[in-house]
Amino acid sequence: MHEEYEGVIIHNVEPLEEAFPPTRLWHRDGQRDEIAFYLKPALKNRPIRNLYIYGPPGTGKTCLIKWILENYFEEIAAYVNCFRFRTTREILKEVLFKFGYIAKESEQNSDLFKKLEEITKKKRIIICLDEVDQIKESDKDEVLYNLVDLRVGLILISNRLPTQLYTLDPRTRDRLNLHDIEFPEYKLNELIDIGIDRRNLAFVPGTFPDSMVQLAAEHSEGDARLLLLIMRNAGRIAEQRNAKKVEEQDVMKGVLEAKRLRKSKLLEKLNEHQKIIYSILEQKRRMPAGELFRTYCKQVKNHVEARTFRLYMFHMCALGLTKAIGAKKWRVYEIVI
């Protein structure tokens, strides 16, 4: 349910929200056409190529996929956010619910897979697993292997590079046979186009000048979600001071608020070990990988092994919380946000 809000500057807050269906998919024509090409056979009940959609946060991955599925594949597609549904059972229940079946508590995972198999025998279906890296590690191979075994078409969405899949069982990787499609960060001019489009829908005419849209875009780090949050914050801040239009001071305060909120949301995606590692790094801002791992091991009795630590750091870099400089034993990690 959308929050009801109407002010002298913002007349409709919905276009500034993440869930708002876009009126136009800006600067993603290539990705849209490529995805449509690989999904189109499903409309004729033919198999599709499994897709791996990747790129930094706020680059339009989820927005574009949901738009395509809802507009062209509504009857045969299920979308699952794996940050909310992390286990095999939760994912299967969510998929089956989409196709009209409510799972019983007494049913085992094997029963749910059989029920899904009954559906796939009647029609070719597509399942999108958004934030696929958030699936519980012990369940990841099970759910992916068995879904492919049922001839389900899969769309996997992640912030992380395709190399994250190296942690899967080789048999699962081979079965998936994924085609990778990258969503790079938006360029400044692309963010400005998106910002102006949403500005025209959300703000009273003349209250959010083009120059302020550009300023917000310059501080958005290629992230359209961050841009919209900055614009929303700026509009509300301007209204709070009874201004007639958004000015530089409103945008800059909006930037600070938006980045604080983004950081808190990203930290929610970390497990307890990752949060400890991040906290250690945050204190020094920059640490050699070896020193960071040793400090973590001293603080945590049941610490993870070096290989898992590297995977955790890879994940935090993919989220944009940290960045890695250098390779192997010379690697240094830095805090980004």
Predicted regions and their residues:
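Mid-core helix/loop region of P-loop NTP-binding domains shared across ATPases and GTPases
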Residues: E3-E17, I65, N71, F83-I194, ...
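Conserved catalytic segments around the Walker B and adjacent sensor/switch elements
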Residues: N50-Y52, Y72-R84
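Short amphipathic alpha-helical interface segments
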Residues: N271-T295
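Terminal-proximal interaction/regulatory segments of ATP-powered molecular machines
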Residues: M287-I337
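A short, basic N-terminal segment
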Residues: M1-I48
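Conserved C-terminal helix/linker of AAA+ ATPases
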Residues: I237-R260
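Short alpha-helical segments that sit at the start of domains
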Residues: V255-Y278
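Walker A/P-loop nucleotide-binding motif
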Residues: N45-W67
